[in-house]
Amino acid sequence: MRFQVIVAAATITMITSYIPGVASQSTSDGDDLFVPVSNFDPKSIFPEIKHPFEPMYANTENGKIVPTNSWISNLFYPSADNLAPTTPDPYTLRLLDGYGGNPGLTIRQPSAKVLGSYPPTNDVPYTDAGYMINSVVVDLRLTSSEWSDVVPDRQVTDWDHLSANLRLSTPQDSNSYIDFPIVRGMAYITANYNNLTPQFLSQHAIISVEADEKKSDDNTSTFSGRKFKITMNDDPTSTFIIYSLGDKPLELRKQDNSNLVASKPYTGVIRVAKLPAPEFETLLDASRAVWPTGGDISARSDDNNGASYTIKWKTNSNEAPLLTYAYAHHLTSIDDSNVKRTDMTLQSATKGPMTALVGNEWTLRETELSPVEWLPLQAAPNPTTINEIMTEINKDIASNYTQETAKEDNYFSGKGLQKFAMLALILNKSDQTQLRNPELAQIALDKLKAAFLPYLQNEQADPFRYDTLYKGIVAKAGLPTSMGGTDDLSAEFGHSYYSDHHYHQGYFVVTAAIIHHLDPTWNADRLKAWTEALIRDVNNANDGDEYFAAFRNWDWFAGHSWAGGIKPDGALDGRDQESVPESVNFYWGAKLWGLATGNTPLTKLASLQLAVTKRTTYEYFWMLDGNKNRPENIVRNKVIGIYFEQKTDYTTYFGRFLEYIHGIQQLPMTPELMEYIRTPEFVSQEWDEKLGAIAPTVQSPWAGVLYLNYAIINPAEAYPALRKVQMDDGQTRSYSLYLTATRPHFFRRSLLAALARHGSTRRPSLPSSGDDDKHEDGFLLRFRRLNPFNLKHRIY
């Protein structure tokens, strides 16, 4: 393949100041989305603690906050057998693992994945694609011959959102070290050796070495030059290229079938890249002298309901444009004016193929931001359902709020608060919803405020603490007993160790936004400070915020959030996320808070993140038929289950039933999720292939989740089901019926489908409760008149 290296015409982004990796200003002040939400000191609301689990390998002199939920977080801590990976992609890196030979930085670049089967479990049938992982193998390790009997010291000397600089150094010798700039999408592993003798180790047999200058007399054991092409005996066969960029050529000796060792100490840069195919060798040669050292990110809105984010890569040199690998979602949204696409690809760890791009600045655009705000796009339910919905709302509002919202943990309490907040919202927006009962609307809002007040005062069963070490808000329960906790690191789903913050905070932020929207005067100052502290903890865009880390949960390169926080034994499969909708719920909540407070940059930023989340969800988490990023048998699962950087697992953390695996991807059902994120195409495929057969048999609250999701494509069938089935603890019957009845063509869908399938005589599959005729005078009677054949129907 012919390839011409070009210098992209870069659009310069002015940066006045930044938190490493996050630019604070774009070219137009009015368009900038990285604007402070607040500078309020959270210690005036939340008692402060210093987190008990400190990073072991962070440079404490640079003043930076150690990231807790980042792709680089494993670098800061020890792990079991030193096997916790760092995944810049397309390479996976492990430090000081015990897989034989001198310790160093191990490179893994698997072209094939390991698929594992699961036996039949509960209502989940046998699958030959229960999980997908990468085998742990030393493809190539960068080390030093001086480290044969010592373990090098390690330190992360600098970091930003897109990179970390790792130093391995000889103990008691600060002048002998290797610096590794580890950067997202890096096409090469870069190692800056200082006064150490390079050594390259592989668990595979090295079957050939080609040097660009000369070989030894016997043509077998010693090689000299600035470029070495190494071929392994793995399957499929791998070829790596080693580039020596120092002042003098490098001389390597093949010590045995697995080791290449330099003849003397070396000072200079060595770069290593996997060669996917012979035709890409000239491309790697042309880009070898320019490497990434980090990056800045900015985001801006435009005038056409769109927004974009820009990654400006930092490099060691402007000698040539940078070569970087991009994920699938980058390729579908990137502005090609600043980059050159190539045909060179490598497999990522779990996101499918990555494609190499040439260019120092990436601008990625989202042109269709969600139009959803507080209510469904068609906010009024079908008029024939209003009386029944109001009857159910009366029942739900008459329930015991304290029992549902004052539980022992914040997660389930937050779910309860949000479900009651949705009722207060639709009653108090009666001009749009047509659900008119002013007295009941006031009761709903008053009861919601009373239930929310203990959280606002931080007097709930598990109060929050402000952590001065990692600069965040944590639950007390998982802290040591000396700090008032239980010593149970898993308490609150690991919230005290920074797991699931966007899930937990999302429910509270949505609730707070609704209260402030309906009554802007209620505890206004404290509510604003409290809510914005929770937002800043998860999604802080302020470059100068001294109280919170930047973008704790959000990953601008991956295009989605990470849930997993600090893991004392290491995150052995990398970062993870299970519930996409609960991450959506947080960003929707941030969007609503922006609307409620008139903070347009926050609203647009959250809208951009929702759009990027939607894009990446259908690339990596939820799989439409024909998805190219996964093996076909994984695609047939329709959802990943638990997604890790190094593994996908068709299960959940809390059990293995189909309704669990798929249902956790459907809650909480909100207008944002129903109207924008979950598409009819995907819901139809998932229902036909996975859920339609089991939904009528589910006798747990998951049935309520499944049928409310089904309402996206078939509200007329879902509505009577939702009258009967159990509800999830974050779901009310009245709001479920309301959402269902707001779906476009609520009744006409049924009639059209019936006429289209007039040859069938099969009734819709609905859960039975023995009272099918209970509402004969209401919905069922009208439904049967519209659908006289009692036909099964599904709308696509």
UniProtKB/Swiss-Prot annotation:
Keyword Ribosomal protein: no
May provide specificity for triple-helical beta-glucan as annotated region, ranges: 647-649
UniProt GO BP: cell wall organization; polysaccharide catabolic process
The enzyme's E.C. designation: 3.2.1.39
Binding of (1,3-beta-D-glucosyl)n, residues: 504, 576, 578, 582, 660
Pfam families named among the record's database cross-references: Glyco_hydro81C, Glyco_hydro_81
Gene Ontology terms for molecular function: endo-1,3(4)-beta-glucanase activity; glucan endo-1,3-beta-D-glucosidase activity
Residue ranges annotated for the GH81 domain, each copy included: 31-759
pH-activity note: Optimum pH is 5.5.
Thermal effects: Optimum temperature is 50 degrees Celsius.
Glycosylated sites: 219, 400, 428
Region (alpha/beta subdomain) residue spans: 277-367
Activity regulation behaviour: Tris binds the active site and may act as an inhibitor.
Result after altering residue 582 to Q: Abolishes enzyme activity
PANTHER family: ENDO-1,3(4)-BETA-GLUCANASE 1 (PTHR31983), GLUCAN ENDO-1,3-BETA-D-GLUCOSIDASE 2 (PTHR31983:SF0)
Family: Belongs to the glycosyl hydrolase 81 family.
Function: Cleaves internal linkages in 1,3-beta-glucan.
Protein name listed in UniProt: Glucan endo-1,3-beta-D-glucosidase 1
